[in-house]
């Protein structure tokens, strides 16, 4: 991704992430869906920005991630890339491949991954699944597109699970997750998100791989962490799972600011003479 800022910093690449794991340096990832937030995240020092299909929930108001389309993901990704380029261009930009954009066939997966990369110059794509998507991951990485995997709770499979409960708590599912992680690494994935699995299992997976793991609700032994920006900033007041640490209560801040604006407009105290031409 080209750098449009005068304050150039080393861009985070897949190689840089591998180096960070080797050095024991934790990787900080957050989601973003728009230009303004991407600028803030990049200049704040995050290592990577995930343009998540969680935009389906927090941006568009859907109950699941399933409705969002490839074109909608590209729209959000273009805005995020422009935001990063306007700042330091340090953060890697990773884009979720939405539901049914890679499940039909490896050929379909390659086509859609290529479209996502070509239209907005992001750094990588992310896909949910293990052995079942291994051929698609290999085909995509073979043509030069980096792939981040995603195991554990996979939101695109929510109707299969029936709930958002912790996954891989039992032996068989835990063993399958370990195997899927190994398969993804062998297929060429440069990193794997581990979502809502026991901390001990996440540690075992992380130690068994040479590629980094990025946890969300998977404990402190992962090589990095990711959160949905709306959750960690306290913008989503109706969703507060155990794994989310709120670093701000922006919902209340925004509400108070809007109430003040409405009051000033109704009292005709805004705009003032100093705010008029």
Swiss-Prot record:
Location in the cell: Cytoplasm
Active site per UniProt: 195
EC supergroup of this enzyme: transferase
Chief site of localization: cytoplasm
Binding of 3-methyl-2-oxobutanoate, residues: 53-54, 96, 126
CDD domains in UniProt: KPHMT-like
InterPro entries: Pantoate_hydroxy_MeTrfase (IPR003700), Pyrv/PenolPyrv_kinase-like_dom (IPR015813), Pyrv_kinase-like_dom_sf (IPR040442)
Family of this protein: Belongs to the PanB family.
The protein, known as: 3-methyl-2-oxobutanoate hydroxymethyltransferase
């Amino acid at each position: 991704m080209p750098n449009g800022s005068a304050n150039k910093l080393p861009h985070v690449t897949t190689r840089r992430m591998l180096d960070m794991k080797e050095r024991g340096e934790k990787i900080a990832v957050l989601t973003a869906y728009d230009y303004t937030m991407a600028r803030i995240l990049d200049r704040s020092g995050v290592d990577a920005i995930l343009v998540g299909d969680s935009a389906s929930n927090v941006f568009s108001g859907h109950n699941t991630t399933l409705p969002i389309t490839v074109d909608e993901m590209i729209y959000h990704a273009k805005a995020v890339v422009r935001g990063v380029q306007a700042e330091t261009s340090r953060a890697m930009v990773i884009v979720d491949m939405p539901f049914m954009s890679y499940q039909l066939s490896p050929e379909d997966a390659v086509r859609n991954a290529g479209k996502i990369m070509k239209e907005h110059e992001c750094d990588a794509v992310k896909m949910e699944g293990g052995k079942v998507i291994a051929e698609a991951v290999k085909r995509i990485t073979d043509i030069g597109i980096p792939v981040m995997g995603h195991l554990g709770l996979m939101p695109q499979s929510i109707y299969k699970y029936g709930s958002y409960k912790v996954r891989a708590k039992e032996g068989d599912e835990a063993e399958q997750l370990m195997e899927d992680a190994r398969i993804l690494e062998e297929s060429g994935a440069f990193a794997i998100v581990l979502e809502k699995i026991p901390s001990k299992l996440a540690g075992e997976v992380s130690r068994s791989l040479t590629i980094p793991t990025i946890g969300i609700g998977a404990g402190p032994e992962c090589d990095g962490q990711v959160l949905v920006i709306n959750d960690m900033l306290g913008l989503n007041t109706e969703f507060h799972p155990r794994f989310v640490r709120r670093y701000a209560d922006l919902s209340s801040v925004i509400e108070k600011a809007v109430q003040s604006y409405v009051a000033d407009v109704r009292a005709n105290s805004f705009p003032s003479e100093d705010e008029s031409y």
